[in-house]
Regions:
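Glycan-recognition surfaces
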Residues: 1-10, 14, 49-50, 54-153
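Short, solvent-exposed turn/loop segments enriched in Gly/Ser/Thr/Pro and often Arg
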Residues: 30-37, 72-77
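Short, intrinsically disordered, charge-balanced linker/junction segments flanking boundaries
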Residues: 22, 35, 190-193
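An active-site-proximal structural segment forming one wall of the substrate-binding cleft
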Residues: 3-31
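Active-site-proximal beta-alpha loop/turn segments in soluble metabolic enzymes
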Residues: 1-2, 36-44
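Glycan-recognition and catalytic regions of carbohydrate-active enzymes
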Residues: 149-193
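Surface-exposed alpha-helical segments enriched in charged/polar residues
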Residues: 17, 21, 54-57, 61, ...
């Protein structure tokens, strides 16, 4: 959709608002890929982004109790302006904990930790096949918004108990992780651990 056009923005605002007003929705992941090449005119990227902000401003004002999460994958949407409408952004579709170390390290150079969506996902990872312990996956996820994206019905009783302990621990450290000072002690680009 050409979000540089007012009539397109109004259409999106109305269509999305209609859905949100008529359903019990508390969370929306706005996974929006955009064309980054072959722009039709000079200034199109800027106009498109302003249209996107217009849409998000209208929708988030109408629905202040819905958590909107942005998504950077494929669309370059992890920008400072988006944080005015979406307090957290999915950093990458690559959810492998080890790969996320570098991504989250780099992202935290420009964005607050509490805006970096980071979840414990299934192992072995569906993108790279790496098998990573539940503890390691949680340790990485603590350094972001922290959540789970896996099928707990496929977990052992022991793993389920570990998840409950991880959630309890995260609740204890949440304020520190979101509002504390961040010191980068090791650069993952300069070491293998």
């Amino acid at each position: 959709l050409d979000l540089s056009r007012d009539e397109v923005c109004e259409y999106v605002i109305n269509a999305v608002s209609n859905i949100l007003a008529n359903a019990n929705i508390e969370y929306v992941k706005w996974d929006m890929n955009r064309q980054l090449t072959d722009m039709p005119r000079l200034g199109y990227n800027h106009e498109y982004t302003l249209g996107y902000y217009k849409i998000m401003s209208a929708i988030t004002e109408k629905f202040p109790n819905i958590l909107f999460e942005g998504c950077s994958s494929g669309g370059g949407r992890f920008d400072a302006g988006v944080l005015a409408y979406m307090p957290q952004i999915w950093t990458s579709d690559n959810s492998d904990a080890i790969a996320r170390l570098k991504m989250q390290y780099s992202t935290s150079m420009c964005y607050p930790v509490y805006s970096i969506s980071s979840h414990v996902t299934a192992s072995p990872n569906h993108q790279c096949g790496r098998d990573t312990s539940l503890r390691t996956r949680a340790d990485v996820a603590y350094c972001g918004t922290f959540g789970y994206e896996l099928d707990v019905t496929k977990m052992s009783d022991e793993e389920f108990e570990e998840i409950k302990a991880q959630i309890k621990f995260e609740k204890r450290i949440q304020d520190l992780m979101c509002n504390g000072d961040l010191y980068r002690l090791i650069n993952p680009y300069e070491t293998n651990y």
